[in-house]
């Protein structure tokens, strides 16, 4: 392990946003505390799982179009799973909070599938906050921050046929770029260009 990788890991663990040079590429680490001006943002932990399960169970439409289920085990797995070739140091599983109340959950991968792209693996709103343009405001802040860190796009996958998700993401500037089969379920891979 090089001194750079251990130094990056240490800085990231304590929440610093720094720039590191690898050849000619500038890598700007994500500081999740800067993802929202309105809500406090923090990493979600195992002790938060019951709260996450409750919010997920209330979002019944989402689970009609995916193989995922809102269980403790699935959420714990989601907190740790990364795409092939991506380390846990590039994964951020966090919540947006209004005081003690969880407003939204997000799983964000830095540098997937390319270094200049951020990937939203999961985004779910607390139903109490839905229909009030809060989700759109959160996504707007996240996208703005990603642009400021040098990302050129944000990518995600929408479960094909899910009208709620399709409407939300297209309303927020994401365009389907291709379809992918994942375990027998069709996903619409969508992207929002930032440059």
Segments from the language model and where they lie:
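Acetyl-CoA-dependent GNAT
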Residues: 27, 32-39, 43-49, 54-128, ...
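Conserved acetyl-CoA-binding loop of GNAT-fold acetyltransferases
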Residues: 16, 170-179
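Short, often N-terminal, low-complexity regions
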Residues: 13-14, 18-19
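Conserved beta-strand-loop-alpha-helix junction that forms the acyl-donor binding cleft
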Residues: 156-166, 183-185
């Amino acid at each position: 392990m090089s001194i750079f990788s251990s130094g990056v890991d240490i800085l990231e663990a304590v929440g610093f946003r720094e720039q590191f040079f690898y050849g000619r590429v500038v890598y700007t680490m994500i500081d999740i505390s800067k993802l929202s001006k309105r809500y406090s943002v923090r990493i979600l932990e195992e002790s938060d799982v019951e709260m996450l399960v409750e919010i997920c169970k209330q979002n019944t439409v989402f689970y009609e179009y995916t193989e995922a289920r809102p269980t403790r085990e699935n959420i714990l797995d989601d907190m740790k799973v990364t795409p092939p070739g991506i380390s846990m140091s590039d994964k951020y599983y966090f919540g947006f909070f209004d005081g003690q109340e969880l407003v939204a959950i997000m799983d964000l991968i830095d540098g997937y599938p390319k270094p200049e792209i951020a990937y939203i693996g999961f985004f779910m709103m607390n139903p109490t906050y839905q229909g009030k343009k809060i989700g759109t405001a959160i996504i707007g802040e996240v996208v703005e921050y990603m642009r400021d860190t040098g990302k050129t796009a944000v990518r995600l996958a929408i479960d094909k046929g899910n009208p709620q998700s399709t409407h939300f993401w297209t309303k927020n500037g994401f365009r389907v770029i291709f379809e992918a089969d994942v375990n027998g379920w069709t996903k619409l891979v969508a992207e929002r260009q930032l440059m």
